[in-house]
Amino acid sequence: MWVPPEDKDPILLMAPTRKSVALFGAVSLRDGKLVTHFEKKFNAMTFRDFLTILLRHRRRMRKIVILLDNAKYHHAVMLRPFLKNHRDRLAMEFLPAYSPELNPIERVWKLTRKLCTHNTYFEKLETLIDAVATEHKIWNVPNETLRKLCCII
């Protein structure tokens, strides 16, 4: 197909920005249910807020084991009292350094990029957040897609 030279490589103008959003997430390996939480930034306080949300989603008499990378805020001193209070319901296991391929949630982030953000221009950060949140609402219930994607053999 012939395309005029001036239309061959269209230039998409976009305003430079340093805006960002933090997204915490966890997948139940038992049933594939996804729990996510948007924040303005990653730090110990926002991580503690996410852990509180995660504890609300846990099944009775079940302990939650979370696989984590070694981000600084995962080891924060201010988390110790919270973790001590919830040690019967919450356990944290740290993955080896520089090994994101071992973290099941990384597969979910890759699928999210593929399905709703890949090769897409979002004029506003809010539009991006809405697109990701809409996709994640589908996965807020037990589902086979995420269960199979995140299964550990």
Predicted regions and their residues:
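Residue-level signal for pocket-adjacent positions within structured domains
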Residues: L29, K33, A97, E144
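RNase H-like DDE/DDD metal-dependent nuclease/strand-transfer catalytic core used by mobile genetic elements
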Residues: T46-M92
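Extended, low-complexity cationic-aromatic segments
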Residues: M1-I53, L149-C151
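RNase H-like two-metal-ion nuclease catalytic core shared by retroviral integrases
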Residues: S20, L68-N70, V77, E93-L115, ...
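RNase H-like polynucleotidyl transferase catalytic core
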Residues: P5-P16, K84-P104, Y121
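Short beta->alpha junction loops/turns
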Residues: K40-N43, A71-K72, Y98, Y121
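C-terminal anion-handling pockets and recognition modules
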Residues: I105-I153
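Short, glycine/charged-enriched secondary-structure capping and boundary segments
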Residues: M1-V3, L79-L83, R107-V108
